[in-house]
């Protein structure tokens, strides 16, 4: 099983951990739904920047 850590950042701010143990990532327009292995959901507004499947990391540019 491949689970991801999702990091987000706003312009001129440090990157922060948004969610951990993410099994599903569902883009919905300007929103991104993140579902973890326990079924908990986190919704963020932003744009996907990168996905590194080897390191299990996802980066999102968060809306201001």
Can you annotate each of these PLM segments?
Residues 24-27, 33-36, 41-43, 51:
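Structural recognition of beta-strand segments within beta-rich domains
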Residues 16, 20, 32, 42-46:
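Short beta-strand/strand-turn micro-motif
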């Amino acid at each position: 099983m491949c689970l991801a850590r999702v990091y987000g950042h706003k312009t001129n701010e440090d990157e922060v951990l948004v969610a951990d143990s993410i099994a599903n990532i569902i883009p919905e327009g300007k929103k991104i739904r993140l579902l973890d292995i326990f079924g908990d959901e986190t919704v963020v507004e932003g744009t996907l920047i990168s996905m590194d499947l080897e390191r299990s990391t996802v980066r999102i540019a968060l809306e201001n």
